[in-house]
Structure formats: structure tokens, C-alpha cells
Curated annotation (Swiss-Prot):
Disulphide bonds in the chain: none
Alphabetized UniProt keyword annotations: Acetylation, Cell junction, Coiled coil, Cytoplasm, Cytoplasmic vesicle, GTPase activation, Phosphoprotein
Origin: domain of life: Eukaryota
Any Pfam family the entry gives: PH
Subunit-structure text: Interacts with activated RAC1 and CDH1.
Keyword Cytoplasm recorded: yes
Name of this protein: TBC1 domain family member 2A
Start and end residues of each stretch annotated as Interaction with RAC1: 297-435
Residue segments, region Interaction with CADH1: 1-171
């Protein structure tokens, strides 16, 4: 067993694992009583080694039960070893904590917790709840430190393969700062954990026979022999003076000074003692309150007498204030009367002192005017007095109401004080009485409440720990997932390199075979054997590699059912197909993280589809497999929404069932020729041929002008493979034939198709003059190859992933995309075509050269960048010019045909001499 060969102790009483681990993390501590109030973080100077006695549940039969074991942690391997005693040289067994999770149950026995590994569940029990929590937290921390100390992630070979590693590491660092929010660190129980715990008395140690591990009997015997030898060697050392302790004990006492054991968790007292204590406290409280109630009553009486005196004094002050105001008013009135008398005296003196009558008359007039003015002032003051009197009456009424309200409040207050006095007397009497049956019920309820509080605290602690464990396991899972992702990316890169090397190897074998020819018999035979072995590698390795890693081999079919490696009868073609499949797989692996993943993310964030420049660029780059059906339905709806009607497709199917169409026979013949390299159309139990038949028959009734034309079966089949619905595939076919392609493209004369071939020749002369000159010198007609490209939009020509990428852009932009990709295909293979000098070799190469294209990104860049400028106006002009010339040629051909028929009709049927007639031939037996 790994880890069992630990270095033995020099003496039987020493502990072999007592060395402190270098760089061990410092553990912050806090007492359990502080958990609810908040966590303080005092740092411990030297954390003790994680070791101590725990009880392990195990055994079989009658000896099954708790067994005391000495546990110690190995930081190098992240293993928790255990032995029967601390003095044993060899551990009994170990627990791998790197992939373990921890659990504690609130309803289990106090101090019990579990360690769950993928292989087994170990149940352990600590002496106290505090020791259990300390062990769990330390094991969590050690597990995380081990995962954090693993070697760094492998460096990616390409920047595109780096992924989101830095972001995930930053997220993990941020989570480390928050991990302590679940469960506060527990104070170290120095008497139960650490090297010093080896000399502490073990709590409730089982009997010696029951404590022996029969499962590890050999290890038990070895440990016993080691202990016996150690005791013999150290027998003299045990009689040294008391002051001469061993260095290990001195070091242990210096490093870990065990604090005096704190008070343990209070046990649950019996019911009688709890009731008596509660009764005593309640009676003591009642007596103290009864001593205060009489003083409170006397105070209330004194307060009432003082309030009445204050009220009488206030009323007396109010009366004296009113009397003072009246005296002041009287003084003012007398003062005014005195002033009026003095003024009258002065006026009379002035009147008598006047010498002439004129002066006296003037004085009289002046007084008359003053009297009139005073009369007006008196009237104004009278009006003001009346308004003030009204205001005063209103205020007096309000004052009376307020006084009534105050009196009401005083009455209420007095009534409440009386009620308080009565209740106080009643409470005092109740407290003075002995506890009765109701009090005993109350005490029992109080006891139950205390038990429930204990249970609630236990469940709260369990919940905090489980949250902490979930957080820790999640962090470890994310770290492992990050490493796994980096390893998968590296594996994909190496697989791509392997595919490239294998394709180069096969290409080299093919070139050697071509160079040797049939001259060297032994070498040719050796090359043939090597090629056969290379072609059989895929089948032999597929079963073995698929178990290890799914993308390690090339699957037989792609996601749409097309063969990835076509089965050719000719050995050279099979070799080329294998090389092509390896190159496609290599490009797919290299582009998965660098190109496809960002593209998938952009499509995932794209909301509702709407025509835009961004959507145009995304469609040119290709639609991911999971988004393609939705995008195609939206593109088709844009094209045929003016033609769609509810129930139209079903009506066409019903019409086809009622009446047989003339094109039904040709459709039936073409069904078996549709995509022979696709499993959906070659499997006898597949439903795709029946769906395709119904779609083509419905279209023949939808468009009677065209009916059915060879090539429509491939267009409808592509739509069925992507959309997987008959009606959607039908409207896709309608969109292509009636809205995207020009008129007469699928007519009997294929007029528009022939026009596009001539337009393509002009564009090739403009964009690729060197290639066209090379082909022109060898009299190669490209229309034999390109005519079918345009008729079926490259179906059966390009490999499936490139074909569907072309269709993504074709359904949005139209026929212009077909011209771009046709030019790009010749540009992609221009150098290979220029190396061929014989016209027969060129024709042979043109028949399969589209299958050699494996880099879809390069082909797309050529089509939409290297072929620019590509104005639609130029395309329309070329089409118009060639259509006019082609129509003239067709008219001339029709005239020649009519003249020929007239000539034949004028000559009549001519029968060669000596040849028997049909009647004679039929008459012969």
C-alpha cells in the first residue's frame, strides 16, 4: 500500500510524523461563541500539525463498532493516514482526500462526521463538537492547498487555445477572499489535536481486543514487534530524572503549550433540577418586585396631591393676572380722560384769548372739522371692535373645547393609573403564590424550547459547514475543469498535428507510387501494403480510441449524414479520400477554438434576426449547426412570405393523391440517385425518401410550368436534411426556384442556366486570365463541370460543411454568391491546374478537385475578398448581352430544325431495298 513505508521511529515512544510541514498555512482562529456575533481573525504563530485521536466506525460481526485510531495528515500526497496508536511505525490504511467530500449530520451523535471518497464512506467521531469542526475545516483547507499546489496548466501552443484561463483564475482568487463567510474558523483544541495529543489520555478508548484491526492484521503484527524492540532499547532511558525530558517533548511543550481545558459544553440537567432552578429564580424575582410596588403606590398618591396644588396655584395666578389687567385698563381710561379735560381747557383758553370774532370763528370751524374726523374714526373703531369681538368669541369657544379635551385626557389618565395599580397588585400576588399546574406546564414548555434551541443551533452549524463544503468543492471542480479544458485543447492541437502528419505520409506514399509506377515490383508491392495498412488504420483505431477520447478519430458520418470518407472502388481515389478526410479533420480541430467558438458566441448573443450588414458577415462565415434551421426558416420566410398561404402545402399533397402527375415517374427514378453517400437516403428504413417524394410532387403541382427538372431533387434533399420538415423544405425549394434563381433557369431549354455559364466564362477570363489561357491552349471546356454547380448550387460537389456555408450566404444574397464561389474554387486550385499539361489529366482532376478543398475559411476569403470588385450591375449587363445572343442562336436552331422536318416530310418515308418491313418481321415465327 502506498504510503505505508514511512520512516520508522528511532524509539518506540517517538512519533515518526512529528516534523512540521514546511510552508503550512496559518489558520485563523475564533471561538465558537463568537460565530453568531462575527468572526475575528487572530493569526496563530505556529499552527500545530494536523494529527490526533479519532474514533472510526468499522469492523464486522460482533466486533463492529467504534475503534480508536491515531490520524495524521500527509501534505505531499493529500492522504489522511491512521494507525491504532500514535507510537505505531506503520499506518494501517490511508484516505485519499484529493477527491473526497466531507459531511456532518445534525441528528447524528455529537462529534460524528463523514469522509466520502469515490470508493467508500468513512465515519469518524471526535471527542467534542469543537474538535469535529476543527478537523473538518483543517481537512478542507489541506485539500484546497493540495489542489492549489498542483503543477501549473500546460502552456497552449497557440494564443487562440488559451481560452478563458486567466479570467477563471481571477474569479477563483476573488472567491478565496469570500470563502470564510460561511463558517468562522474554530479555535484549535490543543488538548485533542497536535503532536502533544499523542500523550494525552484517550477518551473512552475501547477494549484492546476490540480495538485491533483484523483487516490489517499483518500491519498490526509489524507495529507490535517494532514497539517491543523499541521498549527494549529504551528501557534504561525511562529511569532518567524527571527534569531530563526528551527533546521531542521539550520541543512539543515549547511549540504547543496546551491551554487548560475550558469548560465543556453544559450537559442536559434532569427535569426536576431544571424546574426547581426556574421556580427559585421566578420566586426571587417576584419578591424583589413586591418590595418595589408599595413605594410605587405611595409615589402615585404624592404625585396626585402635588398636581392638585399646582392646579390651584395656577388658577389663583390666572385670577390675579386678570385683576391686574383690569387695573391697568382703568388707569389708561383715567389718563385719557385727564388728557381730554386738559385739552378742552387749553382750547377754551385759546377761544377766550382771541381778540376778534374772525379768529374765534376760525377756531370753531377747526373744532367742527376735528369733531367730524373723530366721528369717522369712532365709526371705524366700532367696526374693528365688532370684528375683534367676533374673533374673541370664536377663540373662547375653541378654548372651551380644548379645556374639555384636556379634562377628558385627565380622566383617562386617572383611569389608566388605577388599572395599573390594580394589575401591579395582582402581579405581586401571583408571584407570591407557589407554582401550580400551569407553572409546571410552563416549565416543561421552557425545557422543550431549550431543546429546540439546541437543535436549531446544531442545524445552523451543519448548514454553515455544508455551505462551506459546497463552496470548496465547487472551487476545486472549477480548477479541475479549467485544467481539463486546457488539456483537451492541447489534445485537439496534437490531434490536428497528427492528422496533418498522417495526411502528408499518405500523400508521400501516393507520390512514391506514382513515381515508381510498375517498374520496380518489390517496391510497388511494399508501397501497396503500406497504403493498405494506412487505409485500415482508421477502422482498427476507431474502437480503441473512441473509448479514451471521442474526437480522436474521424467519425464515419457527419452531423447531416454524409460520409466523411467516401467508399471508392479505385485504390487511388480511396487514398485521396482518406487524405482529404484527414485534412478536413485537422482544419476542424485547429479552427474549433480560434474560429468556431467565437462565432458560436456571436450567434448565441444575436437576438431577433433582421437584415443588416452584421448578419450578412455572419452568414458568410457560416451558421452553427444548432442555429441553422432557425436561420434558414427566417431567410425562406423573407423570400416567400407573399406566396405562402395557410394549408397550401397540404392542399397540393391532396391534389397529388387524387391525380397522378406526369413527372411522378421521373421523380421516382431520381429518388434512388439522390445523395448515395448520405445514410438518410440510402437506409431502407429511413423516412427521408418518402418526404422527398412528397415535396417534389407538391412542387410539380405548385409550378406546372417547370413541373420537375433533374437537379431539383438535390435542392429539396439539402433543405430536408437541414430543416427536417416537409413543408419548410417545400417552401425552401419554392424560394430557390421562383425567387432567387432567374426565370427559365429550370425550364426545358435551361436558357438562364446556359446564359450563366457564358457569364462565368467572361468572369474567369477577367479574374483568372493565366488559368484560362492555360485551359484554352488545351481546349478544355469548363461548362461540362460548372453547369451542374449552378443547377444544384454545388450539391454533390463540395464537402458538406463547406456546401452548407455556401448555402447560408446563397439564401440571403442570391445567385451572386454562386458566381463568387465558382471563381474562388478555380482560384483555390489554380496552381494545381497549371501544373497539369494533358487535357485528359485536367478533365480527370476537374471531376473530383472540388472534394480536395478542406479550408473553408480560405475559400470564403477568396470568394468575398480576392474576387472583389464584383458589382451586380456588371453581372446584369453580361447576362443581358449573352441572353440576347443565346436567344438568337436558339431561334436560328429552331428554324434549321423546322426546315429539316419540312424536308423530311416532303421526301416521305424511305425504306432501304432488301430490308424487311415491320409487318414482315412480326409475321415471322
Amino acid at each position: 500500500m502506498e504510503g505505508a513505508q514511512e520512516s520508522p521511529a528511532e524509539s518506540g515512544s517517538s512519533v515518526p510524523w512529528s516534523e512540521e510541514p514546511a510552508g503550512s498555512a496559518k489558520v485563523p482562529e475564533v471561538s465558537l461563541s463568537e460565530e453568531s456575533e462575527g468572526c475575528t481573525r487572530p493569526l496563530e504563530a505556529t499552527p500545530p500539525k494536523l494529527c490526533g485521536y479519532l474514533s472510526k466506525f468499522g469492523g464486522k460481526g460482533p466486533i463492529r463498532g467504534w475503534k480508536s485510531r491515531w490520524f495524521f495528515f500527509d501534505e505531499r500526497k493529500c492522504h489522511l493516514y491512521y494507525s491504532r496508536t500514535a507510537q505505531d511505525a506503520n499506518p494501517l490504511d490511508s484516505i485519499d482526500l484529493s477527491s473526497a467530500v466531507f459531511d456532518c449530520k445534525a441528528d447524528a451523535e455529537e462529534g460524528t462526521f463523514e469522509i466520502k471518497t469515490p470508493n467508500r464512506i468513512i465515519t469518524l467521531k471526535a471527542a467534542t463538537k469543537q474538535a469535529m469542526l476543527y478537523w473538518l475545516q483543517q481537512l478542507q483547507m489541506k485539500r484546497w492547498e493540495f489542489h492549489n499546489s498542483l503543477p501549473a496548466l500546460p502552456a497552449a501552443h497557440d494564443a487562440a487555445l488559451a481560452g478563458n484561463g486567466p479570467a477563471l483564475r481571477l474569479e477563483l482568487e476573488q472567491e478565496e477572499e469570500e470563502e470564510e463567510a460561511f463558517l468562522c474558523p474554530v479555535k484549535t483544541p490543543t488538548d485533542l489535536v497536535g503532536v502533544a495529543a499523542a500523550w494525552q489520555p484517550v477518551h473512552a478508548r475501547p477494549l484492546a481486543l476490540q480495538n485491533i484491526s483484523l483487516k490489517h492484521l499483518g500491519t498490526e503484527i509489524q507495529n507490535t514487534m517494532c514497539n517491543i524492540r523499541g521498549n527494549k532499547q529504551t528501557q534504561g532511558a525511562n529511569h532518567r530524572p524527571p527534569g531530563e525530558d526528551s527533546p521531542l517533548i521539550e520541543e512539543t511543550q515549547r511549540e504547543e503549550q496546551p491551554s487548560p481545558p475550558g469548560p465543556g459544553a453544559p450537559g442536559k440537567d434532569p427535569a426536576n433540577s431544571l424546574k426547581s432552578s426556574l421556580t427559585t429564580s421566578l420566586i426571587r424575582k417576584a419578591k424583589s418586585q413586591s418590595n418595589t410596588f408599595p413605594l410605587f403606590s405611595e409615589g402615585l398618591m404624592r404625585n396626585r396631591t402635588a398636581q392638585e396644588k399646582v392646579l390651584a396655584l395656577e388658577q389663583q395666578v390666572l385670577m390675579l393676572t386678570k385683576e391686574l389687567k383690569a387695573q391697568k385698563e382703568l388707569v389708561k381710561i383715567l389718563h385719557k380722560a385727564l388728557e381730554a379735560a386738559q385739552q378742552e381747557k387749553r382750547v377754551s383758553s385759546a377761544y377766550l384769548a382771541a381778540a376778534q370774532d374772525k379768529d374765534r370763528l376760525e377756531l370753531v370751524r377747526h373744532k367742527v372739522r376735528q369733531i367730524a374726523e373723530l366721528g369717522r374714526r369712532v365709526e371705524a373703531l366700532e367696526r374693528e371692535r365688532e370684528s375683534l369681538a367676533q374673533t374673541a368669541s370664536l377663540q373662547e369657544q375653541e378654548i372651551r373645547e380644548l379645556q374639555q379635551h384636556v379634562q377628558l385626557l385627565l380622566d383617562k389618565n386617572q383611569a389608566k393609573q388605577q388599572v395599573i395599580c390594580k394589575l401591579s397588585e395582582k402581579v405581586t400576588q401571583d408571584f407570591m403564590k407557589a407554582p401550580e399546574e400551569a407553572d409546571r406546564d410552563f416549565l416543561s414548555q421552557q425545557e422543550k424550547m431549550e431543546h429546540l434551541k439546541d437543535d436549531m443551533e446544531a442545524y445552523r452549524t451543519q448548514n454553515r459547514f455544508l455551505n462551506s463544503e459546497i463552496h470548496q468543492v465547487t472551487k476545486i471542480w472549477r480548477k479541475v475543469a479549467e485544467k481539463e479544458k486546457a488539456l483537451l485543447m492541447k489534445c485537439a492541437y496534437l490531434q490536428a498535428q497528427n492528422c496533418q502528419v498522417e495526411s502528408k505520409y499518405l500523400a508521400g506514399l501516393r507520390r512514391l507510387q506514382e513515381a515508381l509506377g510498375v517498374e520496380a515490383g518489390e517496391c510497388s508491392e511494399l508501397l501497396r501494403q503500406l497504403i493498405q495498412e494506412a487505409l485500415q488504420w482508421e477502422a482498427s483505431e476507431a474502437s480503441a480510441d473512441s473509448v479514451v477520447l471521442s474526437p480522436s478519430t474521424i467519425s464515419e458520418y457527419d452531423e447531416y449524414g454524409f460520409l466523411t470518407v467516401p467508399n471508392y472502388e479505385v485504390e487511388d481515389l480511396r487514398l485521396l479520400a482518406k487524405i482529404q478526410a484527414l485534412e478536413v479533420h485537422s482544419h476542424h480541430l485547429l479552427a474549433h477554438e480560434a474560429v468556431e467558438r467565437p462565432l458560436r458566441e456571436r450567434w448565441a448573443t444575436l437576438g431577433e434576426l433582421a437584415p443588416s450588414a452584421e448578419l450578412k458577415q455572419l452568414l458568410r462565415a457560416g451558421v452553427p449547426h444548432e442555429h441553422r434551421p432557425r436561420v434558414w426558416r427566417w431567410l425562406i420566410r423573407l423570400r416567400v412570405q407573399h406566396l405562402q398561404a395557410p394549408g397550401c402545402y397540404q392542399a397540393l399533397l391532396s391534389r397529388g393523391q387524387a391525380c397522378k402527375h406526369s413527372a411522378a415517374r421521373q421523380i421516382e427514378l431520381d429518388l434512388n440517385r439522390t445523395f448515395p453517400n448520405n445514410k438518410h437516403f440510402t437506409c431502407p428504413t429511413s423516412s427521408f425518401p418518402d418526404k422527398l417524394r412528397r415535396v417534389l410532387l407538391a412542387f410539380s403541382w405548385q409550378n406546372p410550368t417547370i413541373g420537375y427538372c433533374q437537379g431539383l431533387n438535390r435542392l429539396a434533399a439539402i433543405a430536408l436534411l437541414v430543416l427536417d420538415e416537409e413543408e419548410s423544405a417545400f417552401w425552401c425549394l419554392v424560394a430557390i426556384v421562383e425567387t432567387i434563381m432567374p426565370a427559365d433557369y429550370y425550364s426545358k431549354t435551361l436558357l438562364a442556366s446556359q446564359v450563366d455559364q457564358r457569364v462565368l466564362q467572361d468572369l474567369l477570363l477577367e479574374k483568372l486570365p493565366r488559368l484560362m489561357a492555360h485551359l484554352g491552349q488545351r481546349h478544355v471546356d469548363l461548362s461540362f463541370i460548372t453547369f451542374n454547380w449552378f443547377l444544384v448550387v454545388f450539391a454533390d460537389s463540395l464537402i458538406s460543411n463547406i456546401l452548407l456555408q455556401v448555402w447560408d450566404a446563397f439564401l440571403y444574397e442570391g445567385i451572386k454568391v454562386v458566381f463568387r464561389y465558382a471563381l474562388a474554387i478555380f482560384k483555390y486550385n489554380e496552381e494545381a491546374l497549371l501544373r497539369l499539361q494533358d487535357s485528359l489529366e485536367i478533365y480527370q482532376y476537374l471531376h473530383f478537385f472540388t472534394k480536395t478543398i478542406c479550408d473553408s475559411r480560405k475559400l470564403m476569403h477568396i470568394a468575398f475578398n480576392d474576387m472583389n470588385p464584383f458589382p451586380m450591375k456588371q453581372l446584369r449587363q453580361l447576362r443581358a448581352a449573352h441572353r440576347e445572343r443565346l436567344e438568337a442562336e436558339l431561334n436560328e436552331l429552331e428554324q434549321l430544325k423546322a426546315e429539316y422536318l419540312e424536308t423530311r416530310a416532303a421526301q416521305g418515308p424511305a425504306v432501304p431495298e432488301g430490308s424487311p418491313s415491320e409487318d414482315e418481321g412480326e409475321a415471322e415465327p
